[in-house]
Amino acid sequence: MSTLHSTPRADGFYMPAEWATQTQAWMIWPERPDNWRLGGKPAQAAHAAVAKAIARFEPVTVAVSAAQYENARARLDVPNIRVVEMSSDDAWVRDTGPTFVINASGEVRGVHWGFNAWGGFEGGLYSPWNRDEQVASKVLEIERCQEYRTEGFVLEGGSIHVDGEGTLITTEECLLNHNRNPHLSREEIEAVLREHLAVEQIVWLPDGLYNDETDGHVDNFCCYVRPGEVLLAWTDDPQDPNYPRCQAALQVLENTRDAKGRTFKVHKMPIPGPLYATEEECAGVDAVEGSQERNPSVRLAGSYVNFLIVNGGIIAPSFDDPMDAQAKAILQQLFPEHEVVMVPGRELLLGGGNIHCLTQQQPAPQRI
């Protein structure tokens, strides 16, 4: 399909909210042995569980390497899951896949952001990442969607959340990090977001969750529930390093209006743990120069906020933690018309993210 030389805003396209009706969800099969322990086998089982949970509500497409195609097809042998061969460097389709945009006449296109493995050679998590840079184009080609490119502008899908009504939430820790777009000012970054997502108001939270190796992605910390309402990861423990981060985010949200002039209603989601990898879990990850080291003394950035909204369902991680039941109850209260499905998320967390990070929703065409 063709690459367009205009912008979504100029063409009447915008990024819809995650709760908009979806055609399908995309995933990528995990196998990288220097990120996923034991050659990715435990993560593959967890990944399959997520895909099957989503497939109860809508179709899923899982991209997989040629080497793993037969294995993935066998593990994902349910009617609503399609498996396609696609090369990539890892499984984080939220960050490497396209951001889909729609217009009022029923067309869907995609934005292909620049990608540098969360920091390039200044804190990035692996190298090379050239196959990941091609994922967005490949997805759009398969779906016959036209593509917008942001040459020279790096952004991961997990670093933004939108309400579909003109407001975007992000973090300074990530988007203003020197290892993403050091040549651009805050105002210039905002201009790119406005042109490619058709948003008006950009809400900057200072930081994301403590020790999030993506440099504080907002999708692990704060997300929309509906327009004007957000769910914020939260701790009341002043000794928790997340405490000042939560307080600072709440301060911003309580003193900011969205694009429609609304003040935010903030719901709080307890943070699980603290969670740590075991020595055995870390020992199962291949040690490769240039890749993220796994260390049992480093706290994991576990979060129940890292869930996916699908058609009629909420797919959220559980951690075998005392907070699991409370997290499910909070989500069910906030989404009364959705079925909340908790899927074990520890193996995904050990790899550096969770359900939202490993999925990318494709909105359905909408005619207005």
Curated annotation (Swiss-Prot):
Q: What is its EC number?
A: 3.5.3.12
GO MF entries:
agmatine deiminase activity; protein-arginine deiminase activity
State the Pfam families in the record: PAD_porph
Q: Which pathway, per its entry? A: Amine and polyamine biosynthesis; putrescine biosynthesis via agmatine pathway; N-carbamoylputrescine from agmatine: step 1/1
Which residues does UniProt mark as catalytic? C357
Q: Does the keyword Hydrolase apply?
A: yes
Q: Name one GO biological process term.
A: putrescine biosynthetic process from arginine
Say which enzyme class the record assigns: hydrolase
UniProt entry keywords in alphabetical sequence = Hydrolase, Polyamine biosynthesis
> How is the quaternary structure described?
Homodimer.
Q: What does this protein do?
A: Mediates the hydrolysis of agmatine into N-carbamoylputrescine in the arginine decarboxylase (ADC) pathway of putrescine biosynthesis, a basic polyamine.
- Family, per the entry? Belongs to the agmatine deiminase family.
Q: Specify the protein name.
A: Agmatine deiminase
Species name for this entry? Pseudomonas fluorescens (strain ATCC BAA-477 / NRRL B-23932 / Pf-5)
